[in-house]
Amino acid sequence: SNQFDIRIVSDNPITWATSTGTCAADSSCGWYIDLDTEVGEKMVANPILRGGRLIFVTTTPSLEACDAGGSSWLMEIDPYTGGRLNFPVFDLNGDGVFDFNDNLASTDGGTTTYTPVSGKRSKVGILQPPAILAGVGGAGDGGYGGAEAKYSSGTNNAQIDVTIENSGILRAGRKSWMQVK
C-alpha cells in the first residue's frame, strides 16, 4: 500500500532583514522549522541540497526508556524559504506519475485547496540520510520532472525504506562541454 503519514510545511513569507539591518532575538528574520520537540524530534544528520530542494531526515526517539528505536520523517522543502515546494514530491496515489493528483486535497467552506506534501513518516523506524539514485524508470513525469529513488536504512530489523520521488527541476544524465581555443 502507498498509504503513509504525511507532513505539510507552511509557505509563509520570509523577512530577510529589517530596515535597520538587524534582526531581533525572537528569530524574526530568516526561517526555521518548529519540530515536535515535545517528543524529542531532532535533525541529527546533515541535510542534502539537491536540485533546488533541501532533503533531510528528522529523528524522534522511542518514548520507552529502554527501547533503542524510534521514528523518522523524510522531508523535502525549499532551501531558500523553508516552505513547501510548489510541485508534488511524493507519489501519494501510487499511480507512478507525479501530477496534480499527488497533492493533498482539503475543503474548507466549499473551497477545495490542493497542497504539495513536504514529508513522509518512515515505516521502518529511525532512518539514515538517504542514498539517492537518479533517473529511475517506471514513473512518468506528469509535467513536473523525472523520478529518483531514495534508499534509507531503518532500525526495524535492518529494513530499507525506498521512496520513489519527483526529482523536480533536476535532470540526470551525462553532462559535457566543449573546449574553446
Q: Where are the language model's segments positioned?
A:
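Beta-propeller fold recognition
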Residues: S1-K181
